[in-house]
């Protein structure tokens, strides 16, 4: 008798979840078009994030993150193979999560990273894009809207897929 009652309650709960599909989603919604930030790359170049008018891969990372360290050479290869006029690659180091900026600069030099790197020293981009896990990547369309989100490391194949769509 108790088993039938529990089964009935369970089926009713599943029905409610199916009826209200949004209630079962725990992931946080991203803003359709994030606010525009004018930032400087580590090389001193002015950059607008999002970069409206051009597809952009926006990637958040730190130098102490093992998956980030593993995937950054793939981002470098991607950057070398894709001229900036097709898809813009912008990476964001969460420098407020690092020991200090010098550690980041040393890491960049040691790994020969030449793609655009923005230092998010105040955590503004981290807050705007709701970064809670690194690495995290976004594909932004020409309007600056978030088309895709990848939490975790990106593979060369995923980078290629994102640029061919």
Swiss-Prot record:
PROSITE patterns tied to this protein: THIOREDOXIN_1 (PS00194), THIOREDOXIN_2 (PS51352)
Any one GO CC term of the record: outer endospore membrane
Record-annotated disulphide pairs: 65-68
Claim: Membrane is one of the keywords in the record: yes
Changes seen on gene knockout: Mutants have spores sensitive to heat, lysozyme and chloroform, and in which the cortex is absent.
Cited InterPro entries: AhpC/TSA, Thioredoxin-like_sf, Thioredoxin_CS, Thioredoxin_domain, Thioredoxin_ResA/DsbE_sf
GO terms (BP aspect): sporulation resulting in formation of a cellular spore
Signal peptide: 1-26
Source organism, top-level taxon: Bacteria
Location relative to the cell: Spore outer membrane
Gene Ontology terms, MF aspect: antioxidant activity; oxidoreductase activity
UniProt keyword annotations, A-Z: Disulfide bond, Membrane, Oxidoreductase, Redox-active center, Signal, Sporulation
Ranges of residues in domain Thioredoxin: 27-165
Database matches in Pfam families: AhpC-TSA
NCBIfam families hit by this protein: StoA_CxxC (NF041202)
Functional summary from the UniProt entry: Thiol-disulfide oxidoreductase with a reductive function, involved in spore cortex synthesis. It could be involved either in breaking disulfide bonds in cortex components or in proteins that are important for cortex synthesis, or in thiol/disulfide bond interchange.
Other comments on record: StoA and ykvU are cotranscribed under the control of sigma E.
Family as reported in the entry's similarity comment: Belongs to the thioredoxin family.
Protein name: Sporulation thiol-disulfide oxidoreductase A
Organism: Bacillus subtilis (strain 168)
Chain's gene name: stoA
């Amino acid at each position: 008798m108790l088993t039938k009652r529990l089964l009935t309650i369970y089926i009713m709960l599943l029905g409610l979840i199916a009826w209200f599909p949004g209630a079962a989603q725990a992931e946080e919604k991203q803003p359709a078009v994030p606010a525009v930030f004018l930032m400087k790359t580590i090389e001193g170049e002015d950059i607008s994030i999002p970069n409206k008018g051009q597809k952009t891969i926006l990637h958040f990372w730190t130098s102490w993150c093992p998956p980030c360290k593993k995937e950054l050479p793939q981002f470098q290869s991607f950057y070398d193979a894709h001229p900036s006029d097709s898809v813009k690659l912008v990476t964001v180091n969460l420098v407020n999560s690092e020991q200090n900026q010098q550690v980041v600069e040393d890491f960049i030099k040691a790994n020969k990273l030449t793609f655009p790197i923005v230092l998010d020293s105040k955590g503004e981009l981290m807050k705007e894009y709701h970064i809670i896990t690194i690495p995290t990547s976004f594909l932004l369309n020409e309007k600056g809207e978030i088309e895709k989100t990848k939490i975790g490391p990106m593979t060369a194949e995923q980078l290629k897929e994102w640029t061919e769509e």
